[in-house]
From Swiss-Prot:
It comes from Prochlorococcus marinus (strain MIT 9301). Belongs to the universal ribosomal protein uL5 family. Gene3D superfamilies: 3.30.1440.10. This is Large ribosomal subunit protein uL5. Pfam families: Ribosomal_L5 (PF00281), Ribosomal_L5_C (PF00673). Part of the 50S ribosomal subunit; part of the 5S rRNA/L5/L18/L25 subcomplex. Contacts the 5S rRNA and the P site tRNA. Forms a bridge to the 30S subunit in the 70S ribosome. This is one of the proteins that bind and probably mediate the attachment of the 5S RNA into the large ribosomal subunit, where it forms part of the central protuberance. In the 70S ribosome it contacts protein S13 of the 30S subunit (bridge B1b), connecting the 2 subunits; this bridge is implicated in subunit movement. Contacts the P site tRNA; the 5S rRNA and some of its associated proteins might help stabilize positioning of ribosome-bound tRNAs. GO terms for molecular function: rRNA binding; structural constituent of ribosome; tRNA binding. GO terms for cellular component: ribonucleoprotein complex; ribosome. NCBIfam families: PRK00010.1. Keywords: Ribonucleoprotein, Ribosomal protein, RNA-binding, rRNA-binding, tRNA-binding. PANTHER family: 60S RIBOSOMAL PROTEIN L11-RELATED. One of its GO terms (biological process) is translation.
Length: 179
C-alpha cells in the first residue's frame, strides 16, 4: 500500500478522531516537500553545480531548479545572478513517493541514527530536517559522487500548529527521537 493510500484510508480518519476535528478537510495533510541544496562553490565551479543538479534529479525524480544570488555580496565573492544552489519542489504522487523512500529507506541509513529532532518545527506545522550527506539515498552510489554534500528537506503541511504537524508526521512514520 502506498503512503498516499495509507494516508487516505487509515491515517486521515485516525487523525480526525485523535485531534478532535469535525470535518475531514480540517485534518492536516502534506502540501509539498522542498528539497534544497546550497552550493557555495557553484559560483566558481560549474561542474559542482552540474553534479548537484543530476544528484537532485536522481534522488527526487524531478529536474532541479538552479537558485541564483539575489544581490552581490563581496565577502562571499558572489555577484547578482550567479548560481548558488538548487531546489526541487515536490507535490502529489512524487511527493508521497519521495516521503516514503526518505522515511523508510534513507533515514535508517544515517550513521548513529536515533531519530529526527522533534523541535525542528517552524511554529506553523512545517518540518525541516537537514541531511549531512547524499549517500543515505539508495539511488546515489558512492563511486559516482565527486564530493559529499548535504541538503535541507522541508515538509510543508496544512497543519495549524506544531502539535498537529507532529501528529501527522508520526502517523506517516517519521521516527522522532525521544529527547
Amino acid at each position: 500500500m502506498t503512503l498516499k493510500n495509507r494516508y487516505k484510508e487509515s491515517i486521515r480518519p485516525k487523525l480526525l478522531k485523535d485531534l478532535g476535528l469535525k470535518n475531514i478537510h480540517q485534518v492536516p495533510k502534506v502540501v509539498k516537500v522542498n528539497v534544497n541544496r546550497g552550493l557555495g562553490e557553484a559560483a566558481s565551479n560549474s561542474k559542482a553545480l552540474e553534479a548537484s543538479l543530476n544528484e537532485m534529479a536522481t534522488i527526487t525524480g524531478q529536474k532541479a531548479l538552479v537558485t541564483r544570488a539575489k544581490k552581490a555580496i563581496a565577502g562571499f565573492k558572489i555577484r547578482e545572478g550567479m548560481p548558488i544552489g538548487c531546489t526541487v519542489t515536490l507535490r502529489g504522487d512524487r511527493m508521497y513517493s519521495f516521503l516514503e523512500r526518505f522515511i523508510n529507506l534513507a533515514l535508517p541509513r544515517i550513521r548513529d541514527f536515533r531519530g529526527v529532532n522533534p523541535k525542528s518545527f517552524d511554529g506553523r506545522g512545517n518540518y525541516t530536517v537537514g541531511v549531512k550527506e547524499q549517500l543515505i539515498f539508495p539511488e546515489i552510489s558512492f563511486d559516482k559522487i565527486d564530493s559529499i554534500r548535504g541538503m535541507d528537506i522541508t515538509i510543508v503541511t496544512s497543519a495549524r500548529s506544531d502539535q498537529e504537524g507532529k501528529a501527522l508526521l508520526q502517523e506517516l512514520g517519521m521516527p522522532f527521537s525521544k529527547n
